[in-house]
UniProtKB/Swiss-Prot annotation:
This is Aspartyl protease UND. The gene is UND. Glycans are attached at N238. The active site is at D76, D268. SUPFAM superfamilies: Acid proteases. It comes from Arabidopsis thaliana (Mouse-ear cress). Belongs to the peptidase A1 family. Plants silencing UND exhibit partial male sterility with reduced silique elongation and seed set. Premature apoptosis-like programmed cell death (PCD) in tapetum from developing anthers, leading to collapsed pollen grains. Residues 58-383 form the Peptidase A1 domain.
Length: 389
C-alpha cells in the first residue's frame, strides 16, 4: 500500500510543481458621474488627459489595503498605470469623496521594485538601489503631471452578486504629486498594456460594457480575467507603447463611407468625446451637411445645430467600422449632446487640429456596447448588447 501511495505521489508531483495558480476573474460594477458634457481632452500619449475627466467618467469602487479603504477610480483604457493619491501629499488636488489613501496604515502595503524605463517612456519608472524604492512620473500634454512611488497592495472588490473578491500584490501608483485640478474620484484605473498594469494580474482578457447614459437604471460593468465577455464581432488590434490600436476601415453617417487608407484608432474610456484628424472630421461634416440639409450653427471645434433640427431627424446611425467588419454605431440622438444652452445640440465628435493622424473614440460613442479584449490573441470583440450581468 505504501509503495502504491509513493507511486501516486511521485506521478502527480511534477503536475503540482508546474501547476499555475488559478487566476481570479473580477466582475466590477461601474457608475458614471452624470456630468455635463464638457471635454477639454488634449490628444497626448498617454491618451488620457486628466482634464478630460471634467466630462463623462465611468468609475469603479475598489478597496485598497488592510484594513480596507475605498477608492473611486476612473476607468481608463488610454493609460496603463493605476494610481491613487496617497497621504501625505503636499501638492495634490482636493478629493471630494473619500480621504487620501494612507499606506502606513495598511499591513498589506509594500514598496515595489522595478526596472528603470527608457528616459522617454511615459510613465517613466526609476529604481533607487539605496532606498530600494521605485518612483514614477507621468506627464500630460496639457501640462498636468503626476509623481509618486510604485507599490503593491491587496485590493478587494464588491462583486455584482453581493460578494467580494480579494487579489494580493497588485501594482499601483501611490501619488505624492497630482497637479491637475479636474480629476473625478480618487485616481485612475489604467487598463492599458504595461509591465505594471493591473491587466497583467488577471491574464490577457478584459471587457467593459457601457449602457445608455440617458437611462438612469442602465447597467455598466468591467470584467477582468478569463471570465471577460469576449464575444461579438472580432477585429484585429495592435499593441504599441502600451496602447491597443484598432484599424478603422470606414465611417458611417447614415450610409457607409469607405476610407482610402485604414486609420489607427484608440478606443479610450478616458475621453468623453471622440476626436478625428482634420481630414476625417470634414468627411463627417460634409456627410452631415448633405444628410440634414440645414445650416449648422458652428463647424468648429464641433458641429452644432438647434435642438429641434436634430430632434426632427429619424433614427440614423453614426459610427465606425473596423478591420474584419466589427462595427460600433450610435443612434444620432445619442451622439448629439447638449453643450452650452439647452436649445443647442453638438456632435460629440471634435476636430483634432494637432499633428496627430489617429482617431480617438470616447465613451459617448460606446453607449450600448460591450468591448472585449483578448490581448494574447491580439483581438478585440465589439458587441451591441444589454449590459446587465
Amino acid at each position: 500500500m505504501k509503495t502504491t501511495m509513493n507511486f501516486v505521489f511521485l506521478f502527480f508531483l511534477p503536475l503540482l510543481i508546474n501547476a499555475k495558480p488559478k487566476r481570479v476573474t473580477l466582475h466590477i460594477p461601474l457608475v458614471h458621474n452624470g456630468a455635463n458634457f464638457y471635454d477639454s481632452k488634449v490628444v497626448s500619449l498617454p491618451l488620457s488627459s486628466p482634464h478630460s475627466q471634467r466630462g463623462l467618467a465611468f468609475m469603479a469602487e475598489i478597496h485598497f489595503g488592510s484594513p480596507q479603504k475605498k477608492q473611486f477610480l476612473h476607468m481608463d483604457t488610454g493609460s496603463s498605470l493605476t494610481w491613487t493619491q496617497c497621504f501625505p501629499c503636499s501638492d495634490c488636488y482636493a478629493q471630494k469623496i473619500y480621504p487620501k489613501y494612507r499606506p502606513a496604515a495598511s499591513i498589506t502595503y509594500r514598496d515595489a521594485m522595478c526596472e528603470d524605463s527608457h528616459p522617454k517612456s511615459n510613465p517613466h519608472f526609476a529604481f533607487d538601489p539605496l532606498t530600494r524604492i521605485c518612483t514614477y512620473q507621468q506627464h500630460y500634454l496639457d501640462e498636468t503631471n503626476i509623481k509618486g512611488t510604485l507599490a503593491q497592495e491587496m485590493i478587494t472588490v464588491d462583486t455584482h452578486d453581493g460578494g467580494f473578491k480579494r487579489v494580493h500584490g497588485v501594482y499601483f501608483g501611490c501619488n505624492t504629486l497630482s497637479d491637475g485640478s479636474y480629476f473625478t474620484g480618487t485616481g485612475i484605473l489604467g487598463l492599458g498594456v504595461g509591465k505594471y498594469s493591473i491587466i497583467g494580474e488577471f491574464g490577457s482578457k478584459f471587457s467593459f460594457c457601457l449602457g445608455e447614459i440617458s437611462e438612469p437604471k442602465a447597467s455598466h460593468n468591467l470584467i477582468l480575467g478569463d471570465g471577460a465577455n469576449v464575444q461579438g464581432h472580432p477585429t484585429v488590434i495592435n499593441i504599441t507603447e502600451g496602447h491597443t490600436i484598432f484599424q478603422l476601415e470606414s465611417i458611417i453617417v447614415g450610409e457607409e463611407i469607405t476610407l482610402d487608407d485604414p486609420v489607427q484608432v484608440f478606443v479610450d474610456t478616458g475621453s468623453t468625446l471622440s476626436h478625428l484628424s482634420t481630414n476625417l472630421y470634414y468627411k463627417f461634416v460634409d456627410a452631415f451637411d448633405d444628410l440634414i440639409g440645414s445650416r449648422p450653427l458652428s463647424y468648429e471645434p464641433t458641429l452644432c445645430y438647434k435642438a429641434d433640427t436634430i430632434e426632427r431627424l429619424e433614427k440614423m446611425d453614426v459610427g465606425f467600422k473596423f478591420d474584419v467588419g466589427a462595427e460600433l454605431s450610435v443612434n444620432i440622438h445619442n451622439i448629439f449632446i447638449q453643450q452650452g444652452p439647452p436649445e443647442i445640440r453638438c456632435l460629440a465628435i471634435q476636430n483634432n487640429k494637432e499633428s496627430f493622424s489617429h482617431v480617438i473614440i470616447g465613451v459617448i460613442a460606446m453607449q450600448g456596447y460591450n468591448v472585449g479584449y483578448d490581448l494574447s490573441a491580439k483581438t478585440a470583440y465589439i458587441n451591441k448588447q444589454d449590459c446587465d450581468m
